[in-house]
Curated annotation (Swiss-Prot):
Statement: the UniProt record of this protein carries the keyword RNA-binding: yes
The name this protein goes by in its record: Eukaryotic initiation factor 4A
Protein source organism: Caenorhabditis elegans
Lineage: Eukaryota, Metazoa, Ecdysozoa, Nematoda, Chromadorea
Occurrences of domain Helicase C-terminal (ranges): 241-402
UniProt-listed PANTHER family: ATP-DEPENDENT RNA HELICASE DBP3
Motif (DEAD box): 178-181
Keywords tagged on the record: ATP-binding, Helicase, Hydrolase, Initiation factor, Nucleotide-binding, Protein biosynthesis, RNA-binding
SMART domains linked: DEXDc (SM00487), HELICc (SM00490)
Amino acid sequence: MTDVKNDVNVSSVVDADGLIEGNYDQVVESFDDMELKEELLRGIYGFGFEKPSAIQKRAIVPCTTGKDVIAQAQSGTGKTATFSVSILQRIDHEDPHVQALVMAPTRELAQQIQKVMSALGEYLNVNILPCIGGTSVRDDQRKLEAGIHVVVGTPGRVGDMINRNALDTSRIKMFVLDEADEMLSRGFKDQIYEVFRSMPQDVQVVLLSATMPSEVLDVTNRFMRNPIRILVKKDELTLEGIRQFYINVQKDEWKFDCLCDLYNVVNVTQAVIFCNTRRKVDTLTEKMTENQFTVSCLHGDMDQAERDTIMREFRSGSSRVLITTDILARGIDVQQVSLVINYDLPSNRENYIHRIGRSGRFGRKGVAINFVTENDARQLKEIESYYTTQIEEMPESIADLI
């Protein structure tokens, strides 16, 4: 597709706080009222959904009716199911060609999307291919030749498959960019633009982004036709049900002793521990192992097979404590996690909700504990102010709360 002309420049409808101004207020309160396929409804209810979330009430209908949609929403709002349901509704499962493409910033998120979409489409006989680096190109080519309806992938591998003529984009009717801000911040702009140019001129574009920096606005202005704009406000991305505490560790080098003390007090079912660097993840994992704590770790330097194994063990519960960087903070759904420890406060305040939202997602209760040095005091206050929340000093009775 080539650049399109819009009646409204989207950058003109973003306020000083970086929030997009919505232009669509139709709300559908029930999945039954969305005119979805019967088999798709079975998949939705079988997945465990009872009623649509705020973004699902607003975005599914315009997406299923072919409109271009920009949704400003973060992890934990139900956005993956929003575009998954929309794609499953729009595609013809009897046509064996690729009809929808979803791009995501990380392999883990792409795999998560594929799993959610497959579960929702359980009764539809739909073939969905995760198209990601670290896996066999030849296998992907074989599967595409055999017949795939939906491709979910990362920009690098998707672009590669298009260039090899393995991925035919000529019949794609719906193109979804998930976490567009994250993809662009990782330097994928050229690849994303190349993929856009390979699309049919009339392709429907759905873009989801937690923030609206200028790079995202450029994409919306160039490639989307008078899009419907939907904002799921910050206060709908609830921290409700998550008890948030901090421990004043004073110095960075005292964090490890503090973590060991916490282990002695708390019986951890499953926990995620976030560090800001890969090196710190490795160092902390080594120290914990030396001290007879069973932990696993995950970061971007690992190969795909290793990362898959670690995530599988953690999801199944055979691994109980996962030490990771922000690679896990966006979009990876680990249902059993009751405790999140920010060993380092996130360097980006937007990532705070991505990290701790994991512990209380979809109404589950959870506890988040932040290790705070003297240098972090101001940052902690900024996080409290940004989310209009309160982070209390950790009480001695913490074991009763987890």
